[in-house]
Each structure stands twice: as structure tokens, then as C-alpha cells.
Amino acid sequence: MSRALRRALLVSLAFIVVAVAGRARAATADGPLGKVRRTNDRIMGLLRKQARSPAGAKPIDRELTRVVAQFLDFPELARLALGRHWEARSATERQEFSELLRQLIERSYLKQLRSNLNYTVRYLGEKIVGDQAEISTSIEVKRKGRSEALVIQYKMRRGTGGWMVYDVITDDVSVVRNYRSQFNRIIQRQSYNALLEKLRRKLKDPA
């Protein structure tokens, strides 16, 4: 699998599972697996609506981002991604960084939803320890006549907003660790402000 495709999956699969094969594992409606399924159902409904009425894409995009905001723990993801540099930042700086990262992830997510990726998902297990959970899935990706399998793990935690995803791991590659490595390298070689500027420029990039 190409690096570009893997990067796309790391973001898009953090929020959506397209089809679930096999019998459901035991899971309560308000548990982590239940949260994933409800989110998936809502997203798929919105995508079907968008396909029927392309002219209404913008309102649907806004609803998609709202659904994602209720599923992905952006503040926790931002804190973990910035790593040891988080403590040195003021409350205002933390909020700014979290918002920039949120916008970048959401934009990438919406882009991937409109791609031609075709994949199905099987749940391998759900593990809950206190307020932490891990959902393991096997995902078969079909692209240009080829089929490849990935094992995706969703890291979730339970907070005031219920169960939310804060990291995704595929092929032993963690979204959080990947971000943290990139951000730390930029801060060490340049500065924290240089990192913010790079994020802002990325947001302005139409690609």
C-alpha cells in the first residue's frame, strides 16, 4: 500500500466505517463500539443525501463536521500531538493550536469522504478498561481492482461528551505519534511559531 493511501486512511478511517460484516460483538448502545456505529450511520445517511442532491453539499458538509466534532477528541489529540511542548503553552496558545489542527483534520476528512476508496470493515474486538477503550478492526481496501487488508485500532476515552476517539493506529503507525514526531522536529529545528505558520499555510493551500 502506498504511503499516500495509508495517510489518507489514517485520517478518514478515524471517523467512519463503511460496512460491518459478521455478527455484532456484545456492546451497549452508549459504549465505544456503539458510538462508532451511530456515527457511521449518521455519516452514511448524510453522504447518501449529498449524492442525491450535490447542490446542497455545503449544508451537509457543515453537518458532517459537526458529527465529527462529537466523535473525535480534538483537544486530547492536540495535547498528545504537541507532546512535551504542550505544557509550555498558555491557555490561549493551546486553544489556537487545537483549532488549527482541528481544521486541518476536518478538511482532510471531507476530502477523503469524496474519494473513490472502497472498503469494508470487520470488528475483531472491543476492550474497555475504566475510561479507556480500544476497538480493533480489520479493513479490506479495494482500489483500482486491487484488494489489501489493514488492521486498524481505535483508541477512545470516556469524558463529559461520552466516548471519543483520540488516536488511530494502523500498521503500527499512530496518528498521534506521527504528528508528534513532525511537530517536535519543526519546533526543535525552527520554533513553535514556525510550526503555527506552517499549519496556517497548509490551511490556505487549496490542494
Predicted feature descriptions by range:
Residues L101, G125-K127, I139-V141, Y154-M156, ...:
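A mature extracytoplasmic/lumenal domain signature
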Residues D167-A207:
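Low-complexity, intrinsically disordered terminal/linker segments enriched in charged
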Residues V11-A19:
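Bacterial N-terminal signal peptides
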Residues R107-E148, L199-A207:
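Surface-exposed, charged secondary-structure patches
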Residues A29-Y109:
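Early exported N-terminus immediately downstream of N-terminal targeting peptides
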Residues A149-R177:
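Short beta-strand edge/turn micro-motifs at domain boundaries
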Residues V20-T28:
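Sec/Tat signal peptide C-region and signal peptidase I cleavage site
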Residues L5-L10:
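N-terminal export leaders
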